[in-house]
Amino acid sequence: MGQARKASDNAVIKFLQQSDADLLCLQEVDVYKNPEHLTLSELKNALKQYPYTYFDFKVYNSRRQFGNAVFSRYPLVNKHTIRYPSRANISSCCDILVGEDTVRLFTNHLESYRFTTSELDSVMAHPFHTDTIIRQKVLSASRSRFRQARIVADSVATSPYPVLLVGDLNSLPVSPTYLLFRLKLEDAFLQSSSLRLGNTFRKGRIGIRIDYILHSFFPTPTDCRPVQATGSDHLPLQATFVW
């Protein structure tokens, strides 16, 4: 969350305050007990225009909490966590009450490759020439991520309501994880884009699409695109749905 900067100096929070979105779904949210860093109460106050919230943290210790957060202008009910045998990954589920309709929301942060800075630089510069350690990390993370995705996909398949699935899937659009979700869900970006790349993560001159807004709604979204913003290594993804 902007490297845990205070709200007054946090580019991510400033962007969210100005977004005028009805629903904010955040992953990798860091809040601290130490008031020199961003605290949970400070985050709530900075986004107090949203009366309904859901905080779902995976990592707890005496100083830091880390996980997902949802801020909404619509009521959130039936909140629960989908946990994995992973120290830093989580999926959060809740139902959004939009007028007389109910939408089931899945906010996700799936397994990453956990590359060091030098490893990431190497992969982005030479994606087809990686060393043994990098290959092992890719294989291990891909397997873990697909297991996580199967757990979420099972919940999606049994949802009694239309589904909105968002977040950092750490998966390319040709990956098994992405294709598993596409068995049941539409990709809002593909439905509304016109030859745009849609990169949501950038390192140097290379960008990739690993963050998504997937859904089982009708009608289709009127817009879905990454938004240029600072403060994070991921670009925020914004979509508009009209009932």
Where in this protein do the model-derived segments appear?
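A long, amphipathic alpha-helix that forms part
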Residues: R135-Y161
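Catalytic domains that recognize anionic headgroups
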Residues: G2-Q3, K14-F15, D22-L26, D30-Y32, ...
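Extracytoplasmic/periplasmic, Sec-exported soluble proteins
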Residues: A4-S8, A21, P35, R63, ...
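Structured beta-strand-rich core segments of catalytic domains in phosphoester-bond hydrolases
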Residues: A4-R5, N10-I13, Q17, L23-S118, ...
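Metal-dependent phosphoester-hydrolase catalytic domains
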Residues: I151-L164, L169-W243
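Short, flexible, mixed-charge acidic loops at enzyme active sites
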Residues: S118-P127
